[in-house]
Each structure stands twice: as C-alpha cells, then as structure tokens.
Swiss-Prot record:
It is found in: Cytoplasm. Transmembrane segments: none annotated. Its EC number is 5.6.1.7. PANTHER family: 60 KDA HEAT SHOCK PROTEIN, MITOCHONDRIAL (PTHR45633). This is Chaperonin GroEL 1.
Amino acid sequence: MAKRIIYNEQARRALERGIDILAESVAVTLGPKGRNVVLEKKFGAPQIINDGVTIAKEIELEDHIENTGVALIRQAASKTNDAAGDGTTTATVLAHAMVKAGLRNVAAGANAISLKKGIDKASDFLVSKIEELAKPISDSNAIAQCGTIAAGNDEEVGQMIADAMDKVGKEGVISLEEGKSMTTELEVTEGMRFDKGYISPYFATDTERMEAVLDEPYILLTDKKIGLVQDLVPVLEQIARTGKPLLIIAEDIEKEALATLVVNRLRGVLNVAAVKAPGFGDRRKAMLEDMAVLTNGQLITEDAGLKLDNAKLEMLGTARRVTINKDTTTIVAEGNETAVKGRCEQIKKQMDETDSTYDKEKLQERLAKLAGGVAVVKVGAATETEMKDKKLRLEDAINATKAAVEEGIVPGGGTTLTHLAADLQKWANSNLSGEELIGANIVEASLAAPLMRIAENAGANGAVVAENVKSRPISDGYNAATGDYIDMLAAGIVDPAKVTRSGLQNAASIAGMVLTTECIVADLPEKKEAAPAGGGGMGGDFDY
C-alpha cells in the first residue's frame, strides 16, 4: 500500500491536532464536577462513562496522521492505567500540556533532543519529591477517603472498599461482579475458594441448601485421574478407622470409583466428597501445590514418585472446615502460617519476574487465595448503562486504594503537582542550563494543568485558582466541589502517590517522544471507488 511521508513542523502539527482532540474529549471528565462522555456502540445501548482510558480507547480519527497523535497520547493513559489503575485523565491532561508547550519551543528553533533530556531530568526530580511527600496510610479511614475520591466522591463505595481491604488484607483480591439488585453489596470469603463444585450432588450433606459441609476433614490431593476404586481402598480404610470425613481433589474421578464413593457416602460408611481440581495444565498443578501447603499435606503425584495405592494418612492435608456447593469449594485451614508465608514469598518472586499481565493476574489471584481471602463487590444499578459506569468507577477506586496502600498518599485535586512547580524551578535553575533548562521549564509550566482543568470543569478560572494555590502552604488546595481553598489532607481529598507519579512519568515520556518526531510515515487514505452503474432493464414479464 502507498505511504504518505510528512516532515518537520508539518508532521508535529498533525500529531498535535490528534492530541488536542483526544485530550479535550478526556479532560471534560476531570474533577468532582467533571461531565460524562457518551460512547456510541454499534451493538447494544450507548455507554455513558467518566473513565479517561476507556474514552481514549474508543477514539479513532479518519486522518491517519492525526490518529497517530491520538494513539501516542492514548499510550500515556493506558500505561498509567496498567501501572496504577487510576489517574488516566490526569496523565492525558499533563501530556497534552507538555506537548503544547514543547512544540512552541521547537517551532521557535529549540533543539528537541536537549528539550527531551531536560524533560526527563525534571521528571526524575519530581518523582523523588513525590516519594518524599507521600504519607503512608494504614487506618481504614484514609483508605476509605482514597476510594471515595477515585469513585467520583461516592462515600459509600469508599467505605465498602476500605471494609474489603480490612478483611482480605494487602495481598487479598477484591473482584467486581454485576449484582442482581439495585444496591451494591460486599461479600467476603475467608479461606481458599476455587470455582469447582462437587462432582455428584449425592455428596451434599445439607439437602435443603444443596451443600456439603465437612468439619475437620482429611484432604487427598492428586493430579491424576482416579479410574479404579482399588487405588483408593487403602486410604479409605485408614480414614474409616479415624471416623473423620474425607475430601478428594483430583483431575477427575471415573464412573466406577465415583459410584463406590457415593454408595459409601449414602450408607454412612464414610463421609466423603469429591471435587475436580481447578485450572488447567501447569496452573492446575501449581494450585494443587498451594492447597497442599495450606492444608499441610502432600500432593500425590507421580513426578514425586508417589502413588495413590500406597498413600499414607500423614500425606493427607487437614482443614478446619470445607464447604462445597455445586459451583464452588471453600477450604478454611489454619495453623500452617510459616509454610504459607514461604509459599507466598515464592509467588511474589514469580510475579516480579514475569512480564505477562495475564500471568501476573493469575499469580496475584493465587497469592490472595493463600494469604487471606477474596472479597467480591456485587455492583447494583437500575439500568445496564448505569451499571457499566459504576463498575468502571469502582474499578478505579479499588486500584487507587491498592496504590495508596503500596506507596502512600499525597494531597489530591492536582494540588501536589502545582506546589512542586516552585521546587522544580529552584532545582532546575541551579542544576540545568541552556535548552535542558527550557525542557524543565516546559514540565514546570505544565504541572498546574490538571488543577486548572479541575477548576474550569467546576466553572472557576483555572489560571487564578492555580496562582492562589501556589501562594498557600503545600497541603492546601482547591476543593472544586465547594469552591473553597482548604487543607486537602485534613479534608480527606487525597491521591495515591503511585497514581500521581505514574501519570507524570508517562506524560513526560510521551511528550519527549512527540517533540523528537521529525518524520511520519502513514498509509495514504484509500480512495473509495464509485459504485458500478446499475444494469439495464432485465426484460421478461416483471418490473424490477
């Protein structure tokens, strides 16, 4: 396909046009008085949302060159989303401000490479300052405030996430599901839960609720299919003597063996239940090993030279209680903290080493199941459109609270970046010179952009608000919801330091890339061929 090649100023201006379009569409959502954006969907109802990165992903322009600008700034938003899970709109507004200021300097003859160096050095300095400013949080109240701000000032959501964090701890997983009612509810599971239920309903001990509840059971873990009941007989005999229940977790149990277990269960010879192992392939094995660590048992696998027919009682795991229904199994075990801690550290190391987001997610899930539990927030809303918007806000709120627990909090509402402008100017004047200093000044001039936009969305004059904030103490900022200047930390208007840091780093990175662009190679727009002329009369007895 033929390409269009554009150089110098013309290339940068085309990118700028695309960046302007995207930044304006996203910036309208910023702050407590930010508006919503409606996304038209080819199929289904339109979506009304307030989430920067989701809007950015939807924007495609007709002009290929302008679309390249959109894609670049979209990257700033999605990288921030990947790192911190929130702050995507702030990253977009910052990147836009840096690009606008930088392009003016490049047009005036500044060297783009030196400007980029200055931008990078300024960004590194600011990151270290944000780390210094960050206050660690531990109390539930501060966590709730963080969630409230990220969810668009919804206090109920903030409190719910703080409760969930309290119950499942730092390593726990908080997942979102679409609820069945109008209200949003929180459901917390203690212990390890996985999505496999009993193989046969005959294992249920409570026929009304169709649940199998085993107290203080032995747990047999194996990664192979159990085909013959003879393999199980030695273990079953040993357990029958103890009078305790048994849970079997295996890849599968064939009909003959299953029938024998069911008959024993119904006759009251042995209280037994069988469940298929969760996951597939290597992941299944890893999850079974996690269960073995949790229940203080051994995974009976041929890789370790162990066979079912010579399994001993001491190889089996134990738990305080196991609850099984048709879809899920929950194991509540205790008293094996040291081994579980070691296993958790091992999983954390694997998480640090992997680059795949999917693998990281799965490892995080395993970690949560081992370390303390899973909380499920069931999102309730009147309509599907509202449900989708609520779900995105909740996702941001969960990510923001996790980021806050990780790296601490800073004053919110664009306040931190605005105050840091003076520190950056002082540092740049004494450490940088020439065009690198101009690069740092570009960053310094852009730092107030998020605050100005928050103020403008609330109907105030952005430039005036920014100047007023700069003249006040470092934790003071502008509360756009009320129009007052207040101590942001005391009022609970806070941002996670990680969100502020990621947004700034990604914005600086994209701005540097755009400024150093000297040529764009893009596809030529395809010429639409005229439709062929209609055929003549078809003849015959019919009118066509």
